[in-house]
Amino acid sequence: MRHFARINGADADLWGAVGLLHDLDFERYPDMPTADPDVAALSHMLVTEGPISAQLPGHPFYGVAHLREHGWSAEVRRAILAHADYSGVHPESPMEKTLIAVDELSSFVIAVALVRASKSIFDVDVAAVKKKLKDKAFARAVNREDIVRGAAGLDISLDDMIQHVVTALRGDAERLGLQGVSPGA
């Protein structure tokens, strides 16, 4: 997210926070409701400052409610809701569209790096990622259609999107533990 914020001339800290926080409730509240008018109305309540008068149905609603309670902006809350296609919040801003685009792809690229003998993001390129995308057994929980739609939502090619994510992860390789291991380690 920070990489794409810099490309867009946006606040890298804000975009980075959205990237870190968007799934903060997923382990505890993994349920994802069906899209319907009630869910959309709840999303609207969570973005605005009005009272929340409905039961929270699961991810990402609990996380967004928590962020609202702790003073996070409507911009952040809306971006997090927009990444859930069932929330009724359609992505509009570059930050919202980018979160959707990198959500599945960044995890997928990390998985590609970690199955390499070197465990290094520096040994991952676009061709390696695309080859693994074709292997439906690899990282089977990752929704490939979401990856393709994410790139399209940013109006960039899938190859360019993958390259951006690889580049971003390389820039943070040490912190993410993706700099690799020594042979025989």
What are these model-predicted stretches?
Residues 2-6, 12, 156-172, 181:
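Active-site hotspot residues in diverse enzymes, especially metal/ion-binding acidic/histidine motifs
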Residues 184:
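Feature captures the catalytic cores and cofactor-binding loops of soluble hydro-lyases/lyases
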Residues 128, 134-161, 176:
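C-terminal binding/interaction regions
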Residues 74, 89-90, 163, 171-179:
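Metal-centered catalytic cores of metalloenzymes
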Residues 3-7, 69, 135, 153, ...:
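Residues at alpha-helix termini
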Residues 8-136, 148:
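Divalent metal-dependent catalytic cores for phosphoryl transfer on phosphate-bearing substrates
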Residues 53-56, 69, 156, 160, ...:
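N-terminal cap/leader regions of alpha/beta-hydrolase-fold enzymes
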